[in-house]
A protein has these predicted regions:
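Core subunits and conserved enzymes of cellular information-processing
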Residues: 2-48, 52, 60-66, 70-71, ...
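Short beta->alpha connector loops at strand-helix junctions that form conserved
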Residues: 15, 107, 123, 151-159
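Glycine-/small-residue-rich active-site loops that bind phosphorylated ligands and cofactors
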Residues: 20-21, 111, 158-159
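Alpha-helical interaction elements in eukaryotic regulators
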Residues: 25, 118, 135-139, 159-163
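A short acidic, amphipathic alpha-helical/loop segment
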Residues: 27-32, 95-97, 142
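S-adenosyl-L-methionine/SAH cofactor-binding core of RNA-modifying enzymes
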Residues: 38-134
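Hydrophobic/aromatic-rich, well-ordered segments within soluble, folded domains that form packed cores
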Residues: 124-150
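Structured adenosyl-cofactor binding patch, chiefly the S-adenosyl-L-methionine
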Residues: 140-190
């Protein structure tokens, strides 16, 4: 898609900020780590509580660096080189930002301002619709207070792994935001009677399907009849 790939290494930082780690986030972090490793990027999961025990499979994932210190401590001498991906930012992320910044910081799901949480719609054969809204802590607003330069990834809400993927495509692969192929609000078939609409924008894969973390669809299907807030 792009004519040139930046030789500058990309450092991705996700500020965890939570005392626990849900199954959803664990799959996202594993996906981010694998893709970062494959692309030669660095992935740092910061502000991880010392009391948090990482799942064994996640801890063994290539490309994952766990840091108990905060972003402010780790990059105290390079604050001007840190870019916060922020839905409230006034400037869209561009390929040139790969030369201006060294660290790209994420605080969770990115998109609507204010964020609208997660909305899952289950459609059954009798047209009954179940809507579940799960609110995550507004991590980005906390990071915004620290004064980092902000960039926006467009108007649609993205999962954390999608936001990282899009950022890497823009700043490392030099693909402008508007040239990336997306799928908005795809539906996942749960069974012959139910399907779930995902309230996010995803990158379209080579198979024309949304790119999701390995195991995510199985996780959604498994917990479709339970509290999805347990996944977050």
């Amino acid at each position: 898609m792009a004519d040139q790939v930046s030789s500058n290494p990309v450092t991705i930082v996700v500020e965890h900020l939570d005392p626990e780690l849900g199954a959803w986030s664990a799959l996202e972090y594993g996906c981010i780590a694998r893709e970062a490793h494959a692309s030669g990027s660095r992935f740092l999961l910061s502000s991880v509580p010392t009391s948090l025990q990482m799942p064994q499979d996640l801890a063994a994932t290539q490309g994952l660096e766990v840091e108990h210190r905060s972003i402010e401590e780790v990059f105290a001498d390079r604050k001007s080189k840190v870019c916060l991906l922020d839905p409230a930012a006034q400037v869209e992320l561009s390929p040139a930002d790969g030369e201006n910044f060294e660290v790209f910081l994420f605080g969770g799901i990115l998109g609507d301002d204010p964020p609208r949480g997660k909305l899952f719609m289950l459609h059954s054969g009798d047209e009954k619709i179940l809507s579940l809204i799960i609110n995550r802590p507004d991590r980005t607003s906390e990071l915004r207070k620290k004064g980092y330069a902000g960039r926006r990834l467009g108007p649609k809400q993205m999962t954390t792994d999608t936001a990282v993927r899009v950022t890497r495509m823009v700043v490392h692969e030099k693909v402008p935001l508007e040239q990336i192929q997306y799928l908005d609000y795809p539906e996942i078939l749960i069974n012959e009677h139910e399907r779930t609409e995902m309230p996010f924008r995803y990158v379209k894969g080579e198979d024309e399907q949304p790119i999701m973390p390995r195991g995510m669809i199985d996780l959604i299907k498994k917990d479709a009849d339970h509290g999805i807030d347990d996944l977050i």
